[in-house]
Amino acid sequence: MSMLFYTLITAFLIGIQAEPHSESNVPAGHTIPQAHWTKLQHSLDTALRRARSAPAAAIAARVAGQTRNITVDPRLFKKRRLRSPRVLFSTQPPREAADTQDLDFEVGGAAPFNRTHRSKRSSSHPIFHRGEFSVCDSVSVWVGDKTTATDIKGKEVMVLGEVNINNSVFKQYFFETKCRDPNPVDSGCRGIDSKHWNSYCTTTHTFVKALTMDGKQAAWRFIRIDTACVCVLSRKAVRRA
């Protein structure tokens, strides 16, 4: 019985050694697999090829029924290209920033996984000097209940509210700025000559990197958030006598 077993093993090894290998199944830059490579090694090579052809933004984070169960590798937040001063992952709600001057401090100190290093502004520098007023009034808040957003392709996507990082639940916050009132004065924007100009305040947007759902995986996407309040002007038609 043992002799038959050894004979079968020998025949199996000879068959594997004689089997031809196709170079088309080998990733670029690698040599042809040796005869002693097993099917497991072959499957690993296939997985590597698929990973190299996949988009760089995809994250290997599986969904287990609910978004709060998604586990994310903290090393992903060390990539500089994924950082945004308006996106914050924190275990506790960030303090309410009175204006965008406080934005750097909030992002740099509240979340260890997406810190940004930017030049420090003087805390004693006032936003407006005496006698100066803003053309439009804006309000800035940290938004922590965003569930959907519009991506850079114009499609509506689901935003991850919470992720698990090192066995701690981090919530995803967005620092958004929008207009308090489209018409801060009766004529529109403040300080505009209403005799010659029509004016109104409107909220503008920008795109930031955020963790969103992509099928059954978490993925980085550019999503649109409110970031500023600006004055829109149009010249009034001149009436000719």
Curated annotation (Swiss-Prot):
Keyword set for this entry? Cleavage on pair of basic residues, Disease variant, Disulfide bond, Endosome, Glycoprotein, Growth factor, Lipid-binding, Metalloenzyme inhibitor, Metalloprotease inhibitor, Neurodegeneration, Neuropathy, Protease inhibitor, Secreted, Signal
**Tell me, what's a Pfam family for it?**
NGF
Q: Which residues bind a 1-acyl-sn-glycero-3-phospho-(1D-myo-inositol)?
A: 173, 209
Highest taxon above the source species:
Eukaryota
Explain what the record says happens when changing residue 187 to N.
Found in a patient with congenital insensitivity to pain; uncertain significance
What Gene Ontology cellular-component terms does the record carry? axon; cytosol; dendrite; endosome lumen; extracellular region; extracellular space; Golgi lumen; synaptic vesicle
Query: Where found, per UniProt?
Result: Secreted; Endosome lumen
- Predominant localisation class: secreted
Presence of keyword Signal: yes
- In the record, what terms sit under GO molecular function? growth factor activity; lipid binding; metalloendopeptidase inhibitor activity; nerve growth factor receptor binding; transmembrane receptor protein tyrosine kinase activator activity
Q: Which residue positions does the secretion signal occupy?
A: 1-18
Record bears the keyword Signal: yes
PROSITE patterns (UniProt xref): NGF_1 (PS00248), NGF_2 (PS50270)
Task: Name the SUPFAM superfamilies on file.
Answer: Cystine-knot cytokines
Q: Name one GO biological process term.
A: positive regulation of Ras protein signal transduction
> According to its UniProt entry, what is the function of this protein?
Nerve growth factor is important for the development and maintenance of the sympathetic and sensory nervous systems. Extracellular ligand for the NTRK1 and NGFR receptors, activates cellular signaling cascades to regulate neuronal proliferation, differentiation and survival. The immature NGF precursor (proNGF) functions as a ligand for the heterodimeric receptor formed by SORCS2 and NGFR, and activates cellular signaling cascades that lead to inactivation of RAC1 and/or RAC2, reorganization of the actin cytoskeleton and neuronal growth cone collapse.
Q: What family does the Swiss-Prot or TrEMBL record give for this protein?
A: Belongs to the NGF-beta family.
UniProt disease annotation: Neuropathy, hereditary sensory and autonomic, 5: A form of hereditary sensory and autonomic neuropathy, a genetically and clinically heterogeneous group of disorders characterized by degeneration of dorsal root and autonomic ganglion cells, and by sensory and/or autonomic abnormalities. HSAN5 patients manifest loss of pain perception and impaired temperature sensitivity, ulcers, and in some cases self-mutilation. The autonomic involvement is variable.
UniProt-recorded name of the protein: Beta-nerve growth factor
